[in-house]
Amino acid sequence: MRGRVSPLMLLLGILVLASVSATQAKSPYRKTENPCAQRCLQSCQQEPDDLKQKACESRCTKLEYDPRCVYDTGATNQRHPPGERTRGRQPGDYDDDRRQPRREEGGRWGPAEPREREREEDWRQPREDWRRPSHQQPRKIRPEGREGEQEWGTPGSEVREETSRNNPFYFPSRRFSTRYGNQNGRIRVLQRFDQRSKQFQNLQNHRIVQIEARPNTLVLPKHADADNILVIQQGQATVTVANGNNRKSFNLDEGHALRIPSGFISYILNRHDNQNLRVAKISMPVNTPGQFEDFFPASSRDQSSYLQGFSRNTLEAAFNAEFNEIRRVLLEENAGGEQEERGQRRRSTRSSDNEGVIVKVSKEHVQELTKHAKSVSKKGSEEEDITNPINLRDGEPDLSNNFGRLFEVKPDKKNPQLQDLDMMLTCVEIKEGALMLPHFNSKAMVIVVVNKGTGNLELVAVRKEQQQRGRREQEWEEEEEDEEEEGSNREVRRYTARLKEGDVFIMPAAHPVAINASSELHLLGFGINAENNHRIFLAGDKDNVIDQIEKQAKDLAFPGSGEQVEKLIKNQRESHFVSARPQSQSPSSPEKEDQEEENQGGKGPLLSILKAFN
């Protein structure tokens, strides 16, 4: 009896097997070569309900080509979307970096309504006149993937390299967002520096703005709750600045700068018939740190007039006129009669593409707006007025040779426009194939805008050694909060970036920097905390701080003797700007030099900093 199976038990077993087979037939296990999606599909098999299981599998299928679904590095036969080379997300990768641009509407810049659209718009350069010539188009850069690479040197002196995507000091042009824009031009604002990295808290109240305008256009009058310094990067502009008692107009060309104090009304005219106007501006808000607002007296598609914010009684009392007249003249609402015809004629000249804060103007308007404008002399104005323009190329350059030159305007009594702001303006021109030698600023923190050309940046920093490589940027910033912990190991990091027109990078005080020009490179610098700042070079015939170190100290600090260090320094006969091509090597073989270095051993952190530039 014990060996016999009950017919009832046998029937129940058959029913269970049939049920399992039916379940597997309805929901077959789908295979995928993406390990991330594979694990998701496996988890779906635990769902008891068929509908929930199918919904789970549908979600997992979408992960197969999702860039957030990281492929395992050890997986074979990885599948990628056609034509795309996929890699894991690295520190510094932002969500907006993965967005794809939408189709441009009407071939013009749109208003800055949703911020996402602004970011997507910055992925591409504008069409027609705004597009660079084909020979100036920036190349698509593939990440070098050298993060964490151990460089040459003695144990404990390795140099870690961070490329453009992981470089907190580098702000590509796509990080600008468009505040106002139409087919006549656009005004863009760079993201806040302190939002990128907490080490830029001193720059919290400094914002970079770019203005681009087509020929014969006008940026409408406005004022802002921020002090501004603008610099003409390209083209010819007539800038008018006015307060309650005075008005000044200046004809500005490339290299001219002008301060617009907070609350002063200003408007910018591109008076050239064929050339686009480009202006770089640094804004320092006076109300809320890091935030500023523009106030327009006239309404446009992008911005309403601040006069509309006042009540009817206030406007009638302020202008001593009836509200209907105020509305017709200033607000263009419900106009009638002769005023309506005049408004229609004005609106006919301002088509839908011409509505906005940048408008097209006639040649007659250009002549009237430039009639009383003053030109800027090479020596600048002798009057001590903060609204007088500055000529960045005034006089002889501060540094100059066959490979480049540098002009600098310092915050002193000669330049009251900069003195109370404690700022300096720097203009650097590096010839193609030249190198601006490694150097640093003793006190100033410099915001650099790439005005023209292409090049490569190398910036050296000393950071707390990071045990786990490849963290997300948020975790990396949290790690920076503990940078000043005593006793923690420090490592030298090299931050690199490929520079192109419109990019911005930061030169913190005391951080060594070298700049290599792959084409003629023009840079514009806004220096913060510039009073008593000194530019200190680490190589070259003149202004070389290492050459000032005593021979005995050199002998203790470097692997070679003091005499060898001094002899090496004298090999470079140029100063400040040199050829980027390395000079001929000494007769001794590299193997012999490495052996001598190993025998000597590293003697100090200065050697590690110098190694970062190799």
Curated annotation (Swiss-Prot):
Region of interest (Disordered), ranges: 72-177, 334-356, 372-397, 464-491, 572-614
Gene3D superfamilies for the chain: Jelly Rolls
Signal peptide: 1-25
Compositionally skewed regions (Basic and acidic residues) per UniProt: 81-132, 464-474
Pfam families: Cupin_1
Bias-annotated ranges (Acidic residues): 475-486
Ranges for domain Cupin type-1: 169-327, 390-566
Keywords, alphabetical: Allergen, Glycoprotein, Signal
Entry-listed glycosylation sites: N516
PANTHER family found in the cross-reference section: OS03G0336100 PROTEIN-RELATED, VICILIN C72
Similarity section: Belongs to the 7S seed storage protein family.
Protein name: Allergen Ara h 1, clone P17
Taxonomic source organism: Arachis hypogaea (Peanut)
